[in-house]
Swiss-Prot record:
Organism: Rhizobium johnstonii (strain DSM 114642 / LMG 32736 / 3841) (Rhizobium leguminosarum bv. viciae)
Catalytic activity reported: (2R,3S)-3-isopropylmalate = (2S)-2-isopropylmalate
Keyword Lipid metabolism applies: no
GO BP field: L-leucine biosynthetic process
Record bears the keyword Nucleotidyltransferase: no
Protein name, as recorded: 3-isopropylmalate dehydratase small subunit
Length: 202
């Protein structure tokens, strides 16, 4: 998993509340367990017309936001059924940070396991960031995980809080496998001691 230390990029505004996982990645795209290629299905029902052509009114189809790395979204983002394909689709599209006032718990935790930073802010701060994100190609935000702050295009700072363990994992690029490997020496030591004290179980 790639480390997340500081991210600077275009922020796309999605002022919609209760965006559920079916909206993020429709069920038709859940037939694969591969993490790559799902970016095409991200918000598919909103991004594409019935004939498969792009909907020019959807934010991620607009020229200024095609390479967005940050999503500023409405309250309760990622609600609905549990599907890890949702953060996979965001990541495959290129989005590594989602900012909202709240997230569904399962989606929130799945983000950290896949290298995406979900940030919770107050409604006042979200309104400011949504306004910043509406500036098109000038909607540049910098998310600094080390200092827990977001810098807007006008230089304004917004602080945010994050669980220290989750912060450590993102800063060091540690998913579940990485966390296990990080404890490799301790695991090896335990296995040797356990084998010596319980030779019949070796």
């Amino acid at each position: 998993m790639d480390k997340f230390v500081k991210l600077t990029g275009v922020a796309a505004p999605l002022p919609v509340v209760n965006v559920d996982t079916d909206m993020i990645i429709p069920k038709d795209y859940l037939k694969t367990i591969k993490r790559t290629g799902l970016g095409t299905g991200l918000f598919a029902e909103a991004r594409y017309n019935e004939d498969g052509s792009e909907n020019p009114d959807f934010v991620l189809n607009k020229p200024a936001y095609r390479d967005a790395k940050i999503l500023v979204a409405g309250d309760n983002f990622g609600c609905g059924s549990s599907r890890e394909h949702a953060p996979w689709a965001l990541l495959d599209f290129g989005i590594r940070c989602v900012i909202s006032t709240s997230f569904a718990d399962i989606f929130y935790n799945n983000c950290f396991k896949n290298g995406i930073l979900p940030i919770k802010v107050s409604q006042e701060d979200l309104d400011k960031l949504m306004d910043d994100a509406s500036r098109g190609s000038n909607a540049i935000l910098t998310v600094d995980l080390e200092n827990l702050e977001i810098t807007g295009p006008d230089g304004g700072l917004i602080k945010f809080d994050l669980d220290e363990f989750k912060r450590h994992c993102l800063l060091n690029g540690l998913d579940d496998i990485g966390l296990t490997l990080e404890k490799g020496k301790a695991i090896d030591s335990f296995e040797k001691k356990n084998a010596a004290s319980h030779p019949w179980a070796a």
